[in-house]
A protein has these predicted regions:
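Bacterial N-terminal signal peptides that target proteins for export
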Residues: 2-12
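Surface-exposed, beta-sheet-biased, low-hydrophobicity segments with strongly acidic/polar composition
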Residues: 26-329
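Residue-level detector of functionally pivotal "anchor" positions at catalytic/ligand-binding pockets or at interdomain
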Residues: 325-345, 351, 359-360, 364, ...
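Surface-exposed loops/turns
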Residues: 350-351, 394-395
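Glycine-centered tight-turn motifs at strand-turn-strand junctions
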Residues: 375-393
Length: 416
């Protein structure tokens, strides 16, 4: 890979040489760089442990279906200028025609949320429980079905009407057509084809399912997306959204971001936009990265890193530069954290303390198992957060089974 040495990075390197000579900064700074290509052509999956894990063309997809065991939504490619409009009841499918595009300016489009991957644009209007926004869970049939439809505006000016019809046994079903009803098609996306991944991508124009997410571990996705930069103001930005198993702590006001500040696991968050876009600013025709900020990142492997952005060229080249210091290595006996919607903190936990369990969908039942298969606790749950006590747990490994109407997930809990 080509390496980009900007004056800003050279200044960082010079200060780092001084810092490394001191006892407080004995660990090596690893510099890395990669490119999103001019115009941010590519989205880049990045592993803090090992570098670029994969790339994909940003414009190749329109929808990204959440294929995690308890996933139940779809994202739109808002970073490419795509918009999603609510269009009423599915029974009005034949009523929607080309006149919708003429009146779309009076309708507020739905947006992806940027706190969690489960906040797809199709989830707008949901209640976080049985109503997913696009569809409602049927407690009799145990399926999610929809009576809603949407209109999609694609970046090339094409308009489509679209309905995400159902999610049954891990299979999304949907239909799509031009506004005048031509080019109608139906298709499905099965979660089982994407085990261990977060998203299955889809191109509506080509009617093509795309497997773009790398098989190898990744921690950050550098991508063009839409962020609410202030209340009611949505704007296209370029930045990093994290893997759901990654946690991040942001530290500001540092004289030397490679040395100052300390990791505090209690200050870490699993919000996917914890790094986001605001580590840089634009002015005078160029970008400047913040020279007083670092991020402490706990990767999917459990390794803890100090991460500092050292350069960003903007859309002219798409080049990104950073430096990182390994604070604590991964436990090689532990497998990387899977892509789940449920999270435990702290983990590991000290015996006798409480553990907070959060889930991106509404939980219905929690079961704690010992590693030898003995049931330790059964907890009825309703909502997206619950506190579990470890008072009755001896030090060791446990399995926490989380159930919701979307499915089940199992998280490993270590009690020390």
């Amino acid at each position: 890979m080509n390496h980009f040495f900007t004056p800003f990075r050279i200044a960082f390197a010079a200060s780092a040489l001084i810092a490394i000579s001191s006892e407080s900064a004995a660990q090596e700074i690893v510099y890395d760089d990669f490119t999103m290509n001019p115009g941010y052509e590519n989205m880049v999956y990045y592993s803090v442990d090992s570098g670029v894990a994969g790339t994909a063309i940003m414009a190749s997809w329109d929808l990204a279906f959440d294929v995690r065991p308890m996933g139940g939504t779809a994202l739109i490619n808002s970073g490419q200028g795509m918009s999603l409009f609510p269009a009423g009841a599915l029974s009005d499918w034949d009523v929607i025609d080309d006149t919708f595009a003429d009146n779309a300016g009076t309708i507020v489009p739905f947006q992806n949320g940027t706190a969690y991957w489960s906040q797809g644009a199709f989830s707008e209007g949901g209640d976080g429980s049985f109503d997913l926004g696009w569809g409602v869970y049927d407690i009799v049939t145990h399926t999610i079905a929809s009576d809603k439809m949407y209109v999609i505006s694609l970046p090339d000016g094409t308009w489509k009407k679209f309905a995400l019809l159902s999610l049954v046994s891990g299979v999304y079903s949907f239909q799509c057509a031009n506004l005048d009803g031509t080019d109608f098609f139906e298709d499905q996306v099965a979660k089982s084809n994407y085990l261990g991944k977060i998203h299955a991508f889809y191109n509506l124009t080509n009617q093509e399912e795309l497997d773009l997410e790398p098989a190898s571990e990744w921690d950050m996705l550098f991508i063009r997306y839409v962020e609410e930069i202030q209340p009611g103001v949505n704007y296209g930005v370029t930045g990093a959204l994290t893997h759901p198993s990654v946690r991040v702590q942001e530290e500001n006001g540092l004289a030397d971001p490679f040395v100052d500040g300390a990791i505090d696991v209690s200050a870490m968050t699993d919000s996917i936009n914890a790094i986001g876009y605001d580590w840089k600013s634009y002015g005078g025709g160029s970008f400047t990265v913040l020279d007083d900020r670092c991020y402490f990142v706990e990767s999917v492997t459990g390794a803890q890193w100090r991460l500092v952005f050292t350069g960003f060229d903007g859309s002219m080249t798409g080049n990104v530069e950073l430096g990182k210091i390994l604070v604590s290595g991964a436990d090689v006996s532990e497998s990387p954290a899977p892509a789940l919607t449920s999270h435990l903190f702290p983990n590991p936990a000290t015996s006798g303390t409480d553990v907070n369990l959060t889930c991106e969908s509404s939980m219905s039942k929690i079961t704690v198992w010992s590693i030898n298969g003995q049931r330790v606790a059964d907890v009825a749950a309703r909502g997206q957060s619950i506190t579990l006590s470890t008072a009755a747990m001896e030090p060791g490994m446990y399995l926490v089974e989380v159930q919701s109407f979307l499915g089940r997930e199992v998280i490993r809990l270590t009690v020390q």
